[in-house]
Amino acid sequence: MTEPLKPRIDFDGPLDVDQNPEFRAQQTFDENQAQNFAPATLDEAPEEEGQVEAVMDAALRPKRSLWRKMVMGGLALFGASVVGQGVQWTMNAWQTQDWVALGGCAAGALIIGAGVGSVVTEWRRLWRLRQRAHERDEARDLLHSHGTGKGRAFCEKLAQQAGIDQSHPALQRWYASIHETQNDREVVSLYAHLVQPVLDAQARREISRSAAESTLMIAVSPLALVDMAFIAWRNLRLINRIATLYGIELGYYSRLRLFKLVLLNIAFAGASELVREVGMDWMSQDLAARLSTRAAQGIGAGLLTARLGIKAMELCRPLPWLDDDKPRLGDFRRQLIGQVKETLQKGKTPSEK
């Protein structure tokens, strides 16, 4: 039995196509290019908070220089000489029964003791301010840790430093929410969402009140010198209150150091953040056409005070910012504008009557 022949099939192109892969030309590096070679880096947005923390840590860390060591050595030698001479004078006055000289030695000892005590106290407060940056780094590590056993002790230490009583409702809710199966990241996150907002709310109220006072003072005061003195005094007082709120006791040098860090933080962040948060909305509302020049200056001074308070809050806070809990200038701007408008309306109402 024979099968019928199949019809012929014609193909337009050849069945086997010669595939010649294209290779890139060989590239070689000479000795000069090999020494200057550097791998390409991806264009990633720099993390502003990490950079600010690095700058803050570098500013807080004392610079170990040769001149500093020489000065410290000279002061130590001078102090030892003063103590030795004082002991010798005291012994001579006791042996010769020179009670006047003995009283002078006692007074000098009291003065020296008070000075040493003040130096030790200032150093301890400055050390406490430096430790806050390390605690913030430790909290950041715990928020990325899957271990157990360290988070609860760390949070209890923070609550004790802030002066939060064990019977506080927020702390009691945190104790009721944690259990042994949770890792350090979960424990610290619960503390950041249950206990830390209590202190943050108080700091926000302090910032809002100081910014409002600065705004109204500038808006109604006709003297620029008085305005500058008032703003400086209010800003220093705001920094002291925020530091005390977060459990940091400031001395003279630690207060100057914190104020310097706040200004450094503001300068490092640059004016882009201020323009981004305020500029567009400021122009859209056409405040220059609605408010007087003094009122606009008052709002600017209030925003500067608010920004100063936000940065002080960021430096004194023991935990890094999570999610969107960081306060923004826009939150205070709307309140300042409303207060200025209300004040101007109250001022116009009696004059119209």
Swiss-Prot record:
Keyword Transmembrane belongs to the record? yes
GO cellular component terms attached to this protein's record: plasma membrane
- Where exactly are the transmembrane stretches of this chain? 70-90, 100-120, 213-233
According to the lineage, what is the superkingdom? Bacteria
Q: Which UniProt keywords apply?
A: Cell inner membrane, Cell membrane, Membrane, Transmembrane, Transmembrane helix
Q: How does it sit in the membrane?
A: Multi-pass membrane protein
Q: InterPro entries per the record?
A: DUF697, UPF0283
HAMAP family in alphabetical order: UPF0283
The record's similarity note reads: Belongs to the UPF0283 family.
Mind telling me what this protein is named?
A: UPF0283 membrane protein YcjF
Q: What gene does the UniProt entry assign to this protein? A: ycjF
